[in-house]
């Protein structure tokens, strides 16, 4: 965190910087020996190359990349090294964050890019513009019922179970990669729906820090962590049985607590391709 404060100090003289926060595992207090430093900068106007390069030079960093504006993520970013420490800076406009908050909290927008940004607001450590960050966090905390239902439906999409009906055939044929892909998709669906039920924004599409992410959640099926581990650690037949039981519990929990329409998912979950007998000799 000392390095982060040193870097943050190089931005203080720029009147266009509205807020700066330490993000990622460092900002969340989860840093380990694999962690890089991630900084989120919020600007009142588009940052120039000079705005972005000045802090790198001020701390004698070694620039690796100065990325152009990414229209999908709505950010500029740069990567550099401070000695052996990797630093990634993500730059956003304050107007973009205000719009994301409006779209997600007021319009139940399920876009993962927007949800990851709101999750970052909640999990980061502000070093500049703390008052603005606090106001954003307050707005992000208003996770409405409509958004819960929408996110549950997004997580429990029937497409997650695209090869579910053929699961026994996949096992019998030794299609290990296909079974693993199916189980992995189910794991993501389970965690995504549980996060929604607990009104928690998805912090990363790859669900980094999985155990920490689901620890302490209140609205969960019994033995969630243990049952998720079975999806990857158990033999395929056992793992698929565990997946079916877990998904059934998740659907019951979601239907009891939300207005999500899970009929199509239920129908897909009940599917099973039956063997019709031995092949002709």
Locate each region found by the language model.
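Conserved nucleotidyltransferase catalytic core and NTase-mimicking acidic/glycine-rich helix/loop elements
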Residues: 135-281
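Catalytic metal-binding acidic patch
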Residues: 22-60, 72, 80-91
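Helical scaffold of the NTase/Pol beta-like nucleotidyltransferase catalytic core
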Residues: 1-21
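Short, solvent-exposed loop/turn segments at secondary-structure junctions
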Residues: 27-28, 94-95, 201-202
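Alpha-helix boundary recognition
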Residues: 12-13, 35, 172
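Conserved NTP/Mg2+-binding pocket subregion across the NTase superfamily
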Residues: 58-173
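Short secondary-structure capping/turn segments at boundaries of alpha-helices and beta-strands
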Residues: 6-8, 24-28, 65-66, 75-77
